[in-house]
């Protein structure tokens, strides 16, 4: 084995796309492996880049255990959870393309989380009926708010993600918002009125856009089409039929 071959096995070449003043700037970075067989996660690469070559590199991370979702970035154009996504030779790390970029790999997330503010009820009384929730309900509550599901979502694509716009929330919905609404529908302590309100909110956010959509993909594997979108569409049709 030559010295060059050994050196190549000790490093990994990646592109990190920084962002400033509305412009992207691709930067080549050579990640130094801790050992020859290491398969570094994207977050490992970003942290080392910040410690060595790019001290001002901005990115988000939290739990480092795929529990919080804030570290999500695009890897080769697809959303990935940085703390649990292996990086390979010549991969490109970039801010999520589905949300406004603030700087480098940091995107504005609050317009998603604020979308349902004041529009859905918050259950604070506990489960006084001692009713067990379904397995599907518990699966939906495992959402980590990574927003990977926004990728290729025709409903979310109706929103403008121009960073110069200061809207508090988006007009049209997305799989995450629909998941939150379907969680209310499936909550055993929700009243019929609360469930109907949640379904109506889904319709108002543009649920009809989902009719011709092949389905959305969750960053942690929740069946969004089968357990969120399709049930909401069925429920909305039932409500519409009852009104006429």
Residue ranges, per PLM feature:
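Iron-sulfur-associated redox domains of electron-transfer enzymes in respiratory
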Residues: 2-109, 150, 154, 159
């Amino acid at each position: 084995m030559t010295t060059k071959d050994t050196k190549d096995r000790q490093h990994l070449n990646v592109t990190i796309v920084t962002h400033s003043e509305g412009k992207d700037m691709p930067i080549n970075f050579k990640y130094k492996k801790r050992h020859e067989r290491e398969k570094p996660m994207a977050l490992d690469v970003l942290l080392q880049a910040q410690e060595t070559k790019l001290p001002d590199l901005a990115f988000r991370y939290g739990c480092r255990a795929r529990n919080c979702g804030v570290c999500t970035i695009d890897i080769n154009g697809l959303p990935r959870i940085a703390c649990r996504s292996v990086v390979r030779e010549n991969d490109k790390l970039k801010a999520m393309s589905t949300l406004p970029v603030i700087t480098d790999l940091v995107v504005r997330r609050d317009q998603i989380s604020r979308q349902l503010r004041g529009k859905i009820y918050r259950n604070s009384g506990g489960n006084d009926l001692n009713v067990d929730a379904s397995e599907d309900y518990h699966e939906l509550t495992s959402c980590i708010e990574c927003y990977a599901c926004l990728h290729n979502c025709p409903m979310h694509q109706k929103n403008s993600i121009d960073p110069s716009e200061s809207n508090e929330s988006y007009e049209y919905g997305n799989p995450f918002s629909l998941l939150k609404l379907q969680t209310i529908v499936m909550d055993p302590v929700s009243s019929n009125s609360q469930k109907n309100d949640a379904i109506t909110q889904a319709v108002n956010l543009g649920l009809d856009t989902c009719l011709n959509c092949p389905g959305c993909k969750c960053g942690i594997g929740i069946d969004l089409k089968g357990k969120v979108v399709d049930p909401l569409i069925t429920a909305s049709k039932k409500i519409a039929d009852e009104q006429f």
